[in-house]
Amino acid sequence: MQNWFRLLRELFFQTKGQEARVTILRIFIMPTNYTNNSLNQEFCKFLAEPMFVIICKLIFLSIILICSLVGNVLIITVVSLRQELRKTLNFFIVNMAVSDLIIPLVSIPFSLAGIATNSLQWPIRGLPGLISCKISQFLKPASLTVSVQSLLWIALDRFVAVVLPLKANLISSRFRAFAIASTWVVAVLINSTDLYTTKLVEVGGNFYCIKENSILRNSFGYGRVVLLTIAPLLLVTILYFAIAVTLRRQNKTLRCTAVKEHSQRKTKAIRMSLCIIVTFNLCTLVYTILTIASLQSEAPNLSCFVNNVLWFLALLGMYLCSVVNPFICFTFVKSYRRGVREIFTGRNYGGGREDLENNKHGS
C-alpha cells in the first residue's frame, strides 16, 4: 500500500495538465467534491521543500508563537490588575486576546509539527486523532470570527461615545457581557460546518487531516467571506466615517481648552481602535483572497512553489494578527505599559489623572 501511495504521488508530480492531476488526486484521497483549484492545492502540499525554507518557516512561526502567547497573556493580566483599564473598549480587546491565544496554543504547534517533519501526516491516530483533527480545523476560523465581531463591537462603542455621547449608557456592563458572549456563540454556529467536513483519512497506513470540498462547505465558505470580511468592512467604514465627521465638527466649534483636551483623548482612543482594525484586515487580506480562489471551480493554475508561498504568507498573516493587537495596545496606552512594568518589577507605578481620563473614554 505504501508503494502504491508513493507511486501515485510521484505520478502526480510527473504529470502535466490540471485534469490529469485532478483524476489522480480523486483516486489518491477519496471520492469527494473537490474543485480543480483546491485539488491542485492539496497535492502541492506534498511537495518536499528545501531545508533552508523549512528552517525559515520554523523560525518565523516560533517567534510568532512566543510573541503571541506572551503579548496576549500580558493584555489579559494587565486589564485584570488595573482598575482604570476596566472599560468597554478594553474588555473587547481582552476578548480578542483570549481568542488570539488559540493561535499559539493550538494552530501554530500543529503547523510547526507539519513543517518540521516536512509531512502532512496527522501525528495522532484513532478517536483522539479524529477529535484533535476536527477541533484544530474548527478553532482557527472560530478565533478569526470572534476577532472580527470584537472589532465590530469596538467600532460601535467608539461610535456611541463620539456620535451619541448622551446614549453612552446603552452599553451597560450587562449588555457588554451579552455582546462578548455572543461573539463566541456566533463563532461556533458559523464555523460548525468545519466539524462536519473535516475528516481524518488513512492513506498508505498514514493519517491525514483533510477538509472535504462538499457543496455544504463551499456554500458556507461564500457565506463566511461575506459575513466575516465584506459586511464587517463596510459597516466599520460607515461607523468610522460618521465618527470622523463628528470629530471634525466638534473641533471647529470647541473653544475651551479643557474640552479640546477631552476631544483629543477621544481621538487618541479612536486612532488606536482604527489601527487595530486596519492591521487586522491587512493581515487577513491574503488569506481571504486565497479562500475565495479555492472555492472557485476555475482558477489560475499556479505552480506548486507559488501556491505554497502564497498559502504560507496567508497563514503567516493570520498568525500575525495575534501579535499586532498587543503591540498596538502597549504602544498607544500608558496604563498598559505601566501594568507590564508592575508585573515584571513588582512595584506599583499607579496612574495619573491623565490615564484615568484617557481610559474613561476607552483608550
Language-model features: where?
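Extracellular N-terminal segment of 7TM GPCRs
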Residues: M1-V70
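Loop architecture of class A 7-transmembrane GPCRs
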Residues: N37-L47, T117-A142, R176, L189-A231, ...
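Extracellular TM2-ECL1-early TM3 structural module of rhodopsin-like
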Residues: P50-S62, L89-W153, A168
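Internal alpha-helical transmembrane segments of multi-pass membrane proteins, especially GPCRs
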Residues: N90, V94-A97, L144, A177-A181, ...
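Intracellular effector-coupling site of seven-transmembrane GPCRs
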Residues: S99, V245-Y287
